[in-house]
Amino acid sequence: KNARLAEDLASGSEYNEIIKAALSTPLQRPRIAPRERKSGIREGTPLVLASDWHVEEEVKPERVAYRNRYNLDIAVQRMQRFFEAVRWAVRQQRDTFKIRDLILWLGGDFLTNFLHEDDVENNQLPPLEVLLFLQAELVKGLLFLLEDEEIEQYIIPMNDGNHSRTTKKMRHATRTQHSLEVFLYAQLKLRFINE
């Protein structure tokens, strides 16, 4: 499947080159091997989902009867709180489990994109600037998680959401070729390739 996708990307722009580079490494299924068999230590692996943040989609209080508010500053605060909560939860579970692996699933729809005409007016950043914003914030969060020296292995499955598409409608055969989040994930992979 990845080989076919790589062939499909063979003719294309710099964007496709980055995607091809990210897909060039063979797909290896991550393995979490039990390490404690005789000592009686119980092992645990946290599974954390990050998705549907829609960071650039502003919610103005006056448009929602003053019941909510959301903007880029709040998005940054929530992202920081998310990563802090992950570290806190891992620390709490260490009273019961030996935790050496962590699965952080990046589930997509981190951005809203310009799927609808009013998104052009309501979103605080255009799509490419949102990618730069998200990349910077996700890198900060991942570096924060990497400070936990007891975690030996981070497994980060990634999938794109429907909002990151660059086409009017979803395309099943070429979905990843038209996904801004696949580009974002490729950039993250390149950034953390040696971590």
Where are these regions (language model features)?
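Short glycine- and acidic-rich boundary segments immediately preceding or forming the N-terminal edge
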Residues: K1-S24
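Generic preference for hydrophobic/aromatic residues in regular secondary structure cores
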Residues: I19, Y154, F192-E195
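Metallo-beta-lactamase
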Residues: F183-E195
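Residues that form generic nucleotide/phosphate-binding pockets
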Residues: A21-A22, F82, K189
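Core catalytic region of metal-dependent phosphoesterases/phosphodiesterases
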Residues: P34-W53, P61-A186
